[in-house]
Structures are given as C-alpha cells and as structure tokens.
C-alpha cells in the first residue's frame, strides 16, 4: 500500500485551527516467522498490516484515534478532538523545528525476497546443531519484519521511513535424569537476511546445546558477597533493566524511579559511562522516533555522573529538558518513552586484567531473566552460566547463580571496565507495548556483589 502523504497533510490542515498540536502516523508492515520445536515445525506464519493513527493536543490533553481504513481518517480526527473533552489538562510539547526527510535501512537481501524454504532450512540447521547428546528439547524461532511509515505533524514535519529487521532465537534443554539445565543464544539486527548469512549458524546452535549440557555437571551456586565479572550480555541486561528503565522520564514523573532528582549527581564509579543510541548498528536502531524527533546519542551517565534522561516531547517540556528522540510505539499505540540501543561504554582492560587480582570470585555469563523495582532501586538477575574465579584464574563451573542488590550501590562498585564490546538483541515490554532493542557493553568487574542461588 502506498502512503498518500498529500491526503494525510490535508487531514491535518482541516483540524489545525482547532488544536494546539496534531500529528499523524501511517504505516504498512510485513512479517514472517517460523517456530521449530523438537524437530517439528510448529508455526510458519506471514502477515501484512496497515494502519493510520492521529493524535491531537487540545486543552492540554491528548486525543488519540486509530483506523486501518484511510477513508475514515477524517472521522478519526474528529473523534480524537472529542476525546480531549472540556477540562484543561497540563500536557504541553513546546515548539519543535519541522523535519522533512526520507530514510531507509539498506539491505542486500530483503527478507521478503528470500524463499520460505531457505528460511526453514536456516531454522532446521540451527535446530539440528543444537541437538547435541544430552539435549532433550530444542526450540528455534525465526522472525523478520519490514515496515514503511510516514509521519506528519502540524509544525510541518514530513518524514518517511523504511525499516527491516531479522532475528533468530535458539533454546536448548538438557537433562541427565536428575535435573534440567538451559542454553540460549540469539543473533540478528537491523537489516536484511544477509545479517543471518554472516553468522555461523551451526556453531551458534552447537554452543547453545553444549552450554545446557555443561551446566548439568556444574556445582551448586555460592552464596554471599564476592568480587564478580559480568560478560557483555549480562552487563547489557543490567544496564537496560536497572539503569535504563530508571532513566525513562515518564517513570521519574510518576515517582517510580530511583534517579528522581539526581541529574548532575554522581551515581556510579568514575569508569561508568552509559549511552542510549538509536543511530548505531543495533536491533533498536531508527532514524526518527514516533514523534518525528531525530534520533541521536544520549549519554545518560558520563564518568559516573547522571547527565541526561530519556524523554518524549511531553516529558521533556515538563522537566525543562530537550526531547531525546525516545518516544516509541507501534503505529496503533500511543508513543511512550522507550530505550533504543543501551550500553555501557568500553574501557581499556583485558579480560585477564579484570580477573587477575580476584582471589575468590564469580564470573557470570548471560542472562536467564530477573526483576527490577525502579522506584526502590533494587534488582535480581539470574545468570545463564557461571564459573568460580580462584587466584586470578577461571575455575569450576557453577549453576543457577543470581546477582542481586541496590542499583546505585552496584554501579558505584564497578572498578574495572573491559575493552571488548558486544550488543545483544531483544524485545522490551512496557505498558503493554513491545519494541525491538539492543543492549550490551564489555566485561565488567564489580566488587563486593551479592551472589546467591536461583
């Protein structure tokens, strides 16, 4: 479906004298997915969708309406105006400079040009490779997404974007009759099928299965305070969940963030610099956010000091800050403050230097989920795989290890930042919405961390 931007512009012109601000997002998307479990194809899906949403600001309140029929957009505009009611709200967005632009993610192999049989073969190869001896169940999930969208607002912006993403997720379950363990790997990014072709899928699958089997023989988890090292995946999960969400300005305005009132304060050690950046190559990349704000790097923490927050136009105005380009949503949802690619900036230490003076510690790799209370600033994460560190050397494997504590205390106990870097892929949920994100960083050393079992 071609998006008629002239028609969308005429809808805005019809209502601009009746509202303080208005914008329209229109988009089309195509997705395909494959799910294989234990050697059998469970799902092979493909679909298309399109939609139009209009948002108006009137009397300090938002009105919002959505339709999948372009001919009803004028009707939806009136519905959105009516939703604002007669009572005065406190929402303002300030004035923004209009943007006129066309952007697209370039791909040498758009997923829609790749035969379904080739995608199934990729999934089958990954599944077969992960099914090593000792693995009793394997699941492989493939997904690709292609979308085109247009954004127009009453300030004169007209932005057209095309985005493409692909991802592959692998899970293996191993059992020895007395217990079970799990292995998980993923790959993908913003771009076409060529991203997965560059990966050694069989090696990725084999490592997934071998991890699960290896954990069956691991020792029980230690418990207490230890010096630890986290790998790039767990570093990224911690930064995303514990710091990134707390830096979302809507949570701060709701009184649900440990970072409330801390701008300009030192909240971490000198070596900690945390960045959210939708312009780098990652699963959470984009050129403009859902409010037409150009994407840009946001340095949240610089050398331990909280320097910025993630903002929408509304939250930025309320806090006296600049919009950061972090209002995100699907076409049919109200934009809310979200992360993009969030990571801890690498330092200059090698892995050997990070562990060399740890006499009795733990090396934590990967993530098996966890939980965070952004208001209280406490967290608990489960590592996918762990090892003892003895006298500066990696020693025996241990399983079911958890990391918990206070977010700010833990950030202040970071005293070594590795020179390596890896950015993972995933989907982040908030307020019933899901967006693609990247998170990562280097290996990191944390002193006196609380470690226990899951």
Swiss-Prot record:
Keywords associated with the record: Hydrolase, Metalloprotease, Protease
E.C. code: 3.4.-.-
Residue span of region Disordered: 92-115
InterPro entries for this protein: Metalloprtase-TldD/E_C, Metalloprtase-TldD/E_cen_dom, Metalloprtase-TldD/E_N, Peptidase_U62_metallo, TldD, TldD/PmbA_N, TldD/PmbA_sf
GO terms for cellular component: cytosol
Disulfide bond entries: none
One Pfam family cited in the UniProt record for this chain: PmbA_TldD_1st
GO MF annotation list: metallopeptidase activity
Highest taxon in the source lineage: Archaea
GO biological process, one term: proteolysis
Function: Probable metalloprotease.
Entry similarity comment: Belongs to the peptidase U62 family.
The protein's name in its UniProt record: Metalloprotease MTH_856
Species this protein is from: Methanothermobacter thermautotrophicus (strain ATCC 29096 / DSM 1053 / JCM 10044 / NBRC 100330 / Delta H)
């Amino acid at each position: 479906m071609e998006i008629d931007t002239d028609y969308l512009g005429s809808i805005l012109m019809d209502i601009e004298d009746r509202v303080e601000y208005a914008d329209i997002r229109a988009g089309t998307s195509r997705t395909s997915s494959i799910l294989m479990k234990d050697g059998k194809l469970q799902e092979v899906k493909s679909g298309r969708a399109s939609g139009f949403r209009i948002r108006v600001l009137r009397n300090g309140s938002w009105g919002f309406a959505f339709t999948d029929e372009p001919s009803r957009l004028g009707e939806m505009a009136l519905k959105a105006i009516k939703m604002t009611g007669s009572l005065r709200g406190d929402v303002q967005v300030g004035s923004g400079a209009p943007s006129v632009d066309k952007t697209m993610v370039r791909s040498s192999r758009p997923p829609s040009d790749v035969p379904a049989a080739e995608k199934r073969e990729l999934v089958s190869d990954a599944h077969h490779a992960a099914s090593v001896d000792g693995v009793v169940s394997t699941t492989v999930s493939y997904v690709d997404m292609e979308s085109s969208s247009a954004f127009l607002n009453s300030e004169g912006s007209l932005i057209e974007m095309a985005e493409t993403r692909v991802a592959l997720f692998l899970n293996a379950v191993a059992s020895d009759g007395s217990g079970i363990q799990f292995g998980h790997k993923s790959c993908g990014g913003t771009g076409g099928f060529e991203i997965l072709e560059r990966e050694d899928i069989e090696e990725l699958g084999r490592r997934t299965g071998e991890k699960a089997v290896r954990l069956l023989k691991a020792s029980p988890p230690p418990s207490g305070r230890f010096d630890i090292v986290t790998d790039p995946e767990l570093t990224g999960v911690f930064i995303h969940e514990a710091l990134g969400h707390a830096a979302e300005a809507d949570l701060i305005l709701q009184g649900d963030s440990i970072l409330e009132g801390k701008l300009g304060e030192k909240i971490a050690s000198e070596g900690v610099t945390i960045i959210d950046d939708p312009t780098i190559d990652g699963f959470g990349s984009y050129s403009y956010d859902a409010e037409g704000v150009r994407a840009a790097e946001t340095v949240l923490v610089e050398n331990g000091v909280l320097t910025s927050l993630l903002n929408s136009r509304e939250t930025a105005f309320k806090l006296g800050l600049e919009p950061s380009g972090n209002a995100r949503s699907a076409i049919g949802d109200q934009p809310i403050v979200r992360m993009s690619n969030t990571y801890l900036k690498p330092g200059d230490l090698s892995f050997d230097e990070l562990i060399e003076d740890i006499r009795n510690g733990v090396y934590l790799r990967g993530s098996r989920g966890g939980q965070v209370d952004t208001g209280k600033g406490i967290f608990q994460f489960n590592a996918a795989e762990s090892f003892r560190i003895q006298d500066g050397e990696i020693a025996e494997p241990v399983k079911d290890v958890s990391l918990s504590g206070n977010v700010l205390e833990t950030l202040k106990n970071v005293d070594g930042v590795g020179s390596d870097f890896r950015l993972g892929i995933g989907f982040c949920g908030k307020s019933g919405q899901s967006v693609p994100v990247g998170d990562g960083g280097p290996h990191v050393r944390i002193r006196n961390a609380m470690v226990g079992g899951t």
